[in-house]
């Protein structure tokens, strides 16, 4: 048996169907670090698969039955459906087929675990918790939903007792994870295609929190009404709350922004009157990011970290890929790439942009899924108020069929109808470049938002602007 995981020390090759996915790749990387043989397939190679190959994995481009080879176990995500040739071959052979969350739970089983859940902010909060535990000497294992800049990866295998994981609520699998400390950042009606109703999602988060052991801890943001309601329903478990509100156990006070850096103090109200961490700074703007940091502070204090350690760790926070990531600056115009694709996320990111620059904010959004745009259409029409200019690209379908009334031009019309002064459609990457050349001036910020191919547009934009300007 492997002492770190309870898994047998030799399983034979573990095959991941969709190994390039951000959730799958982290598990694969940690398994390799523990000495297991890993192989996997994906539709195409990527930086993620290249990294896994450099660590010793075998990668197959494209998915076909023959890729399994001598695989002894097959790991799949919820995105892999019946009919996938590798899944069908595994079942034909009678191989164990393991869901991603089940394999993650196996890795967690012999560690003390911190699991971070919430509709928004999971990845950044996971990174912040990992950053603080690193500074505190805990040497944690980390499996995240985004690439942590300090690691150059979304995963890290540490030798310490603690494991920090992002807990994905999208398919309900987060309730399989054996969390010792459970963090809830917020709860919004998302992923209804799985949950069916908001009440079912609420129950999922209730189960996530109440599944912790009696010696565990729930860390919950009571600035969010749904999370505060959840706290009121939970009994017989220890809870620490965080937020900006006066009742929060871990509370941000005296917040101000200077040159895109958040400066604040943290009142540790659960530790008694007068307990404050003064002079905190976070090198990224946004009230939502300060809130995420409070969750990490709550965990760090629970685990015994000193105030100075916490202050120093957050001040050096390196961030996470595609979360308000600066990809370039051309002619005094800052270009940001962000994963935000839900109205709540978009509004928070644009508010952060407004706090970070003195010039104008130009938002470029690629809606992700027709179903999301359709179900949250009115929210999308009002979440861009902090942007001076809004450009909407074609919907990234993610395999969905178009829905009447939920397309690019519908959203542009909706923005204008709701009072936005400058909203327009863009057709392609060339169109984005033309827009920026036409609209952006020194001191402005261009924020590219979305979960699809918009990230490539953002990353290409600085070179395109410099190339044609030369």
Swiss-Prot record:
<comment type="function">
    <text>Cell wall formation.</text>
</comment>
<keyword id="KW-0067">ATP-binding</keyword>
<dbReference type="InterPro" id="IPR036615">
    <property type="entry name" value="Mur_ligase_C_dom_sf"/>
</dbReference>
<dbReference type="GO" id="GO:0005737">
    <property type="term" value="C:cytoplasm"/>
</dbReference>
<keyword id="KW-0573">Peptidoglycan synthesis</keyword>
<keyword id="KW-0131">Cell cycle</keyword>
<feature type="binding site">
    <location>
        <begin position="118"/>
        <end position="124"/>
    </location>
    <ligand>
        <name>ATP</name>
    </ligand>
</feature>
<dbReference type="GO" id="GO:0008763">
    <property type="term" value="F:UDP-N-acetylmuramate-L-alanine ligase activity"/>
</dbReference>
<keyword id="KW-0547">Nucleotide-binding</keyword>
<keyword id="KW-0436">Ligase</keyword>
<dbReference type="GO" id="GO:0008360">
    <property type="term" value="P:regulation of cell shape"/>
</dbReference>
<dbReference type="InterPro" id="IPR000713">
    <property type="entry name" value="Mur_ligase_N"/>
</dbReference>
<comment type="similarity">
    <text>Belongs to the MurCDEF family.</text>
</comment>
<keyword id="KW-0961">Cell wall biogenesis/degradation</keyword>
<keyword id="KW-0963">Cytoplasm</keyword>
<dbReference type="Pfam" id="PF01225">
    <property type="entry name" value="Mur_ligase"/>
</dbReference>
<dbReference type="InterPro" id="IPR036565">
    <property type="entry name" value="Mur-like_cat_sf"/>
</dbReference>
<dbReference type="GO" id="GO:0051301">
    <property type="term" value="P:cell division"/>
</dbReference>
<dbReference type="InterPro" id="IPR004101">
    <property type="entry name" value="Mur_ligase_C"/>
</dbReference>
<dbReference type="Pfam" id="PF02875">
    <property type="entry name" value="Mur_ligase_C"/>
</dbReference>
<dbReference type="InterPro" id="IPR013221">
    <property type="entry name" value="Mur_ligase_cen"/>
</dbReference>
<dbReference type="GO" id="GO:0005524">
    <property type="term" value="F:ATP binding"/>
</dbReference>
<dbReference type="Pfam" id="PF08245">
    <property type="entry name" value="Mur_ligase_M"/>
</dbReference>
<protein>
    <recommendedName>
        <fullName>UDP-N-acetylmuramate--L-alanine ligase</fullName>
        <ecNumber>6.3.2.8</ecNumber>
    </recommendedName>
</protein>
<keyword id="KW-0133">Cell shape</keyword>
<dbReference type="GO" id="GO:0071555">
    <property type="term" value="P:cell wall organization"/>
</dbReference>
<dbReference type="InterPro" id="IPR005758">
    <property type="entry name" value="UDP-N-AcMur_Ala_ligase_MurC"/>
</dbReference>
<dbReference type="GO" id="GO:0009252">
    <property type="term" value="P:peptidoglycan biosynthetic process"/>
</dbReference>
<comment type="pathway">
    <text>Cell wall biogenesis; peptidoglycan biosynthesis.</text>
</comment>
<dbReference type="InterPro" id="IPR050061">
    <property type="entry name" value="MurCDEF_pg_biosynth"/>
</dbReference>
<keyword id="KW-0132">Cell division</keyword>
């Amino acid at each position: 048996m492997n002492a770190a995981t309870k898994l047998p020390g030799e399983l034979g090759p573990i095959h991941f169907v969709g190994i390039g996915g951000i959730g799958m790749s982290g598990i694969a990387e940690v398994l390799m670090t523990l000495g297991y043989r890993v192989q996997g397939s994906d539709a195409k190679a990527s930086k993620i698969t290249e990294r896994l190959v450099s660590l010793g994995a075998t990668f197959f481009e494209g998915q076909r039955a023959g890729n399994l080879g001598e695989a002894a176990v097959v790991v799949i995500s919820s995105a892999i459906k019946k009919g996938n040739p590798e899944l069908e071959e595994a079942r034909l052979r009678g191989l164990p087929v393991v869901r991603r969350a089940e394999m993650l739970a196996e890795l967690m089983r012999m560690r003390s675990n911190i699991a971070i859940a919430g509709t928004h902010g999971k990845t950044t909060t996971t990174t912040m918790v990992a950053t603080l535990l690193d500074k505190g000497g805990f040497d944690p294992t980390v499996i995240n939903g985004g690439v942590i800049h300090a690691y150059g990866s979304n995963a890290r295998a540490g030798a310490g007792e603690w494991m920090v994981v992002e807990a994905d609520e999208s398919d309900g699998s987060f309730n399989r994870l054996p969390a010792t400390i459970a963090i809830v950042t917020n709860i919004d009606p998302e992923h209804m295609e799985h949950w069916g109703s908001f009440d079912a999602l609420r129950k999922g988060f209730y189960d996530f929190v109440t599944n912790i052991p009696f010696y565990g801890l729930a860390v919950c943001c009571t600035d969010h009404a749904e999370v505060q309601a959840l706290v009121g329903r939970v009994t017989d478990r220890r809870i620490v709350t965080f937020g900006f509100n006066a009742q929060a156990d871990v509370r941000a006070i005296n917040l101000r922004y200077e040159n895109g850096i958040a400066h604040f103090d943290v009142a540790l109200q659960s530790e008694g009157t007068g307990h404050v961490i003064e002079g905190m700074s976070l090198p990224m703007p946004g009230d939502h990011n300060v809130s995420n940091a409070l969750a990490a502070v709550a965990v760090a204090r629970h685990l015994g970290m000193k105030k100075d350690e916490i202050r120093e760790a957050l001040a050096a926070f390196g961030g996470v890929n595609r979360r308000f990531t600066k990809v370039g600056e051309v002619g005094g115009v800052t270009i940001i790439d962000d994963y935000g694709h839900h109205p709540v996320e978009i509004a928070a990111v644009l508010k952060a942009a407004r706090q970070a620059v003195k010039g104008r904010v130009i938002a470029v959004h690629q809606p992700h899924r027709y179903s999301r745009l359709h179900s949250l259409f009115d929210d999308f029409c009002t979440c861009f108020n902090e942007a001076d200019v809004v450009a909407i690209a074609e919907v990234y379908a993610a395999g969905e069929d178009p829905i009447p009334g939920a397309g690019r031009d519908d959203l542009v019309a909706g923005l204008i109808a709701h009072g936005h002064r400058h909203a327009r459609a863009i057709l392609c990457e060339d169109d984005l470049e033309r827009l920026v050349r036409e609209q952006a001036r020194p001191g402005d910020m261009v924020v590219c938002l979305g979960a699809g191919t918009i990230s490539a547009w953002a990353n290409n934009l600085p070179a395109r602007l410099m190339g044609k300007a030369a």
